[in-house]
Amino acid sequence: MAGRLLVLSNGHGEDLIALRVLQCLHQRHPELEIAVLPLVGEGSAYAPLEQAGALRRIGPRRSLPSGGFSNQSLRGLLADLWAGVLGLSWRQWRLVRRWGRSGDPVLAVGDLLPLLLAWASGAPYGFIGTPKSDYTWASGPGSAGVAALYHRCKGSEWDPWEWGLMARRRCRLVALRDRFTARGLRRHGVAALAPGNPMMDGLQADPLPAALEHQRRLLLLGGSRMPEALGNLRRLLGALEDWDPQAPLLLLAPCGSRPAPAEWEPLLRGLGFAPERIPDGTGAAAAWRRGPVQLLVGSGRFAAWAGWAELGLAAAGTATEQVAGLGIPALSLPGPGPQFK
């Protein structure tokens, strides 16, 4: 399977999902030349695979004030416009058009923006639709209200202009996150598949160390966008201050490259935590304690630690969905970040 592939993704969660797909694709077809254009942010999630020589990031990239959520608020949109989002999008569009002239395929991961750019390339394209599920309006707390009625009338969380792009002849693949959503799009003439949700791949928990077996275990998810992540973690930890646990409590705080350990220290010291020895077998980068509460911080430890948790306390996006997908209850505390606007 020689050739080239351009991958478009529009957000940190989408980058992680695309990364998981590309890891498997590279294992099966190491001769395939993979180029990645992150439409939102720097695409730092791709760095390990890029360093391994499996792909390369191309094109203009910039971290925007809204974090990719300019459609959630007028303030976010205006901030992105001031930061030059129109010029950035124009340069990205031109790059995709140049790629399309070669006839090499494009894979879009996300929602409307990468799907639209993939269609505009003029080349064959595929689409992995990550953010939308018909379960959000068909049942449960989200099944009432104007938005749910709108989706129910359409018969899909996806909008007509989106499924119109998915139904084009040049669109060779449409993969969605669940069978229920795929079935809704098939009624609109889209050959949608639901082969599985990539965000749930690779979440193989390490064995729980014996030293942690007798502690209650809570997973803290502050998100990956700075500086909101530190503020989110401060709120999550603050929400636990009045709780007097009847048993020793372990807080697991996996993170990415940010916040870095040095960025954690002033936050934790300000909340009365003191550093202590890291328990064996945890893979933590740092350990802190305040009375009966122990907190472990670990970069890149989400996949290993998520399965240890009895409860998730979250202000994150994709990671919150992954925890719920593992069957672990998750409480989401909306914060001031752009994803909650």
Protein language model regions, located:
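Nucleotide-activated sugar donor-binding and catalytic core shared by glycosyltransferases
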Residues: 1-341
